[in-house]
Each structure stands twice: as structure tokens, then as C-alpha cells.
Amino acid sequence: GHLSLMQRSLAENATTVVSIFVNPTQFNNPEDLLKYPRTLAEDIKKIAGLNPNIIVYAPSVEDIYEGKVLSQPFDFDGLEHQMEGKFRPGHFDGVGTIVKRLFEIVSPANAYFGEKDFQQLLIVNKMVEKTQLKVNVIGCPIHRESNGLAMSSRNERLNVQQ
């Protein structure tokens, strides 16, 4: 999953920065935010094992939102109301807000997103287009577990039957 995005970035760029941030503005249900896996120490070990030169940026909520945890409203030409957006109003405003903020802080030439979250990939592309940020958004193929399930940090919440 995410390690494959890093591998691609390492192959195509002189410097790779990985952001790790659980964004509160993406969660409609506060319980989902509390249950979301947070494994920063493990993640940093995996990243260092992949390549010790990767820069890890793991800001706090305060670093990002400076005391005001609010998402910026975006017009994604209606894409935010389709598919997942039908069931999670405001979710993609949260996505747009955090990705825009991270792009402003890091100033990447290239940003890599998995095609597993295809609607999110389209949303990020639309946000970059509308805000005229100078970032090349690159979609990367889905990586799967040996049983065919798409790799995801949320998989740890599933049991064998699911």
C-alpha cells in the first residue's frame, strides 16, 4: 500500500517526504476518529527500513490547524456529492483542506496517491486544478494482500469472516 507509494517517489525524486497525519476534519463520526489506527512509531520503523533518507513529517493537529480545526469549503464540481460523498457530507472538504495545507507546507513537485481511494485521487486533482497549486498528482496502482483484499490500515479492524 503506502510503502509502494514511497518506493515510487524514491525512484522518481531526489527527496521523498512522507506525511503522517490523522485528519479530524475527514471524520463525520467522532467515534470513527477515535477508532482510527494510530501506529506512528511502527510506521516510522517501516519507513526507515525502506529507506533511511525518507523525511517523515508527522505534525500535530495544532501544527496544521493552529487552534481552529475547521475544513475549508471546496467546490469539486459535484464530485464531492457522488459515491462516498453521498454518505459522508463534508468529508471531501476535509480531504481538500488537509492536502492543500500539506502541499503549502511541503511544496512538493510530485505527490503520490493510491488508486484504491479513487474518488479521493480525483478530488485531490480537482483541488490542485482549482487552487492552481504547482503539484503533479500521480495515481499509483492498488496493491493487494495475498487473499486479494486491497491493502489498507483499516484492514486490521476486520475479522476473518469479513
Features from the language model and the residues they span:
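Nucleotidyltransferase catalytic core that binds NTPs
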Residues: 1-162
